[in-house]
């Protein structure tokens, strides 16, 4: 797919294809880019994506694209980022302070720093290898999926807007949800709790 001459493009949806490469360096007007699901079993995958020139991007969907790395440090306008089901060695979202939605699950992440992402409302970081997660700066969070990691503690006392919290399949021994009075869904199964206070 050659879109190098289509410099006026603002929206590009290539989801559910078999792309092995995509050059969007000339498409600086892009605000929406969807590359969901480029993986076909046994086939070559996309592996890399250069969006450093695409500073107008507000929406980037590249889940299950086969990426081994993703640099979004130049994409400061991003409000939506979904990069789950990739084999990323790491994810740096420290420059993406406008993010309200972040999905980076199933990505073999061992750490995730969201301290700069104070506008975050939804965070999906489940099924990684996280041993800690600090969401104390994310006071706008309404949805948190951090299940199936290796968390031994989780502090959600600052997240008073939380309505959905899934933290099962971790190694938690305690969890204080006394400040989370808006919670409607709470998943705690398969942890190491001996007592749970939901008073």
Question: What positions do the PLM features span?
Answer:
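Canonical leucine-rich repeat
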Residues: 1, 22, 46-51, 70, ...
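Leucine-rich repeat
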Residues: 6-8, 27-31, 43, 54-58, ...
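Concave beta-strand-loop units of leucine-rich repeat
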Residues: 8, 13-18, 34-46, 56-67, ...
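A broadly tuned "polar low-complexity/structure-edge" signature
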Residues: 24-38
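Intrinsically disordered, low-complexity Ser/Thr- and Pro-rich stretches
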Residues: 123, 134, 138, 155-159, ...
């Amino acid at each position: 797919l050659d879109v190098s001459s289509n410099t006026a493009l603002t929206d590009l949806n290539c989801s559910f294809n078999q792309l092995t490469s995509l050059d969007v360096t000339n498409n600086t007007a892009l605000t929406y880019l969807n590359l969901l699901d480029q993986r076909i079993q046994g086939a070559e995958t996309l592996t890399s994506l250069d969006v450093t020139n695409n500073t107008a991007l507000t929406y980037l969907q590249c889940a299950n694209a086969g990426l081994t790395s993703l640099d979004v440090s130049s994409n400061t306008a991003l409000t939506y980022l979904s990069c789950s089901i990739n084999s990323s060695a790491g994810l740096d979202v420290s420059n993406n302070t406008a993010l309200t939605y972040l999905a980076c699950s199933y990505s073999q992440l061992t750490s995730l720093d969201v301290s700069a992402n104070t506008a975050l409302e939804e965070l999906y970081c489940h099924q990684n290898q996280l041993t800690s997660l600090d969401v104390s700066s994310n006071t706008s969070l309404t949805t948190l999926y951090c299940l199936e990691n290796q968390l031994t503690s989780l502090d959600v006392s600052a997240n008073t807007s939380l309505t959905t919290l899934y933290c099962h399949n971790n190694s938690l021994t305690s969890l204080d949800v006394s400040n989370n009075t808006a919670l409607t869904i709470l998943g705690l199964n398969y942890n190491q709790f001996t007592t749970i206070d939901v008073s």
